[in-house]
Amino acid sequence: MSEYLLLLVGTVLVNNFVLVKFLGLCPFMGVSSKLESAIGMSMATTFVLTLASILSYLVNQYLLLPFDLGYLRTMSFILVIAVVVQFTEMLVQKTSASLHRALGIYLPLITTNCAVLGVALLNINEDHNFFESAIFGFGAAVGFSLVLILFSAMRERLAAADVPAPFKGGAIAMVTAGLMSLAFMGFTGLVK
């Protein structure tokens, strides 16, 4: 049980996919200008990342490995991710039309988020079992969400701050992301 907790904490804080592995930088920079959109993207990404991680593990174990189709791994994982995103979009549209409108274009954009494919491939490379795959996917999603929401809150405050003209916009966002990455480096010794 403690192994699973260490995997979760390690994935969320120590080996954060955005700040340490540099995966998912496009939505990190693109969706983080408003806190509302960052929260919506975080919720959708958490669901998709967790489900895609589990399904990718199952596809690999019960389809690709038994039939010696390892060379189709990346393509099949992309297909799994696209199916999960479409399923998520249909589910959200059917259950909550207001949430679907709020998420808007962000749902289909999850398909192109490299963090989702990265988690699926790292699950296989690190030889995780089913439960570890689920925890790894969920931990990666929580880490992505944590960083996205924190960064979004900082960018909203920076928009209201008196920032020198050369640093306005993307420049101060990159400096802030770098400082945030340095702060997360403090978690390095937390999990071995």
UniProtKB/Swiss-Prot annotation:
GO biological process: electron transport chain
Membrane topology: Multi-pass membrane protein
Cross-referenced InterPro entries: Ion_transpt_RnfA/RsxA, NqrDE/RnfAE, NqrDE/RnfAE_oxidrdctase
Alphabetic keyword roster: Cell inner membrane, Cell membrane, Electron transport, Membrane, Translocase, Transmembrane, Transmembrane helix, Transport
Transmembrane parts of this sequence: 5-25, 39-59, 65-85, 102-122, 134-154, 171-191
Compartment(s): Cell inner membrane
Pfam families: Rnf-Nqr
E.C. number(s) listed in UniProt: 7.-.-.-
Gene Ontology CC terms, in alphabetical order: plasma membrane
Family: Belongs to the NqrDE/RnfAE family.
PANTHER family in UniProt: INTEGRAL MEMBRANE PROTEIN OF SOXR-REDUCING COMPLEX, ION-TRANSLOCATING OXIDOREDUCTASE COMPLEX SUBUNIT A
UniProt subunit comment: The complex is composed of six subunits: RnfA, RnfB, RnfC, RnfD, RnfE and RnfG.
Function as written in the Swiss-Prot or TrEMBL entry: Part of a membrane-bound complex that couples electron transfer with translocation of ions across the membrane.
Protein name, entry field: Ion-translocating oxidoreductase complex subunit A
